[in-house]
């Protein structure tokens, strides 16, 4: 326990903030190539087959990214753009793939929250 005089002289060091998306290196998005596209099962109270892809980024990192929406056209060697954002019931999945960018098609039938899924405006 420091004395008051020690605190006045040196102060306290603030706790370092942990980076939740280290592979992005401060960038809003990063480009990468899918090395594997597969499904995983979520944590305990939930049950599903969630679609994920292992992506090798341009900076050399290899990360697991979630593929949002119903249905996708991704396969090995597809070029994708990823953003930060974890999936709460999939441990180790801390990134999302952006729909409607590069090799990833947007959703056709989407009416609401279209910008998240790369969907065109319906006529």
Curated annotation (Swiss-Prot):
The GO terms describing molecular function are: rRNA binding; structural constituent of ribosome; tRNA binding
Can you supply one Gene Ontology CC term for this chain's record? small ribosomal subunit
Q: Name one Pfam family in it.
A: Ribosom_S12_S23
Q: Which residues carry this modification: 3-methylthioaspartic acid?
A: 89
Gene3D superfamilies from the xrefs?
Nucleic acid-binding proteins (2.40.50.140)
Q: Which GO terms describe its biological process?
A: translation
State the InterPro entries in the record: NA-bd_OB-fold, Ribosomal_uS12, Ribosomal_uS12_bac
Entry keywords, A to Z: Methylation, Ribonucleoprotein, Ribosomal protein, RNA-binding, rRNA-binding, tRNA-binding
Q: Per its UniProt entry, which superkingdom is the organism in?
A: Bacteria
The record's comment on protein family reads: Belongs to the universal ribosomal protein uS12 family.
The free-text function statement in the UniProt record for this protein reads: With S4 and S5 plays an important role in translational accuracy.
Q: How does it assemble?
A: Part of the 30S ribosomal subunit. Contacts proteins S8 and S17. May interact with IF1 in the 30S initiation complex.
- The entry's protein name is Small ribosomal subunit protein uS12
Q: What organism is this sequence from?
A: Gluconobacter oxydans (strain 621H) (Gluconobacter suboxydans)
């Amino acid at each position: 326990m420091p004395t008051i005089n020690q605190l006045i002289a040196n102060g306290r060091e603030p706790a370092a903030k942990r980076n939740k998306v280290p592979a992005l290196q401060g960038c809003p998005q990063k480009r990468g190539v899918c090395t594997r596209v597969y499904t995983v099962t979520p944590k305990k109270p939930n049950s599903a087959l969630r679609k994920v892809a292992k992506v090798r980024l341009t900076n050399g990192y290899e990360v697991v990214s979630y593929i949002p929406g119903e249905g996708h056209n991704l396969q090995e060697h597809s070029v994708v753009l990823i953003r930060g954002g974890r999936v709460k019931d999939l441990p180790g999945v801390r990134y999302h793939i952006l729909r409607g960018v590069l090799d990833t098609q947007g959703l056709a039938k989407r009416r609401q929250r279209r910008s998240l899924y790369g969907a065109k405006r319906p006529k």
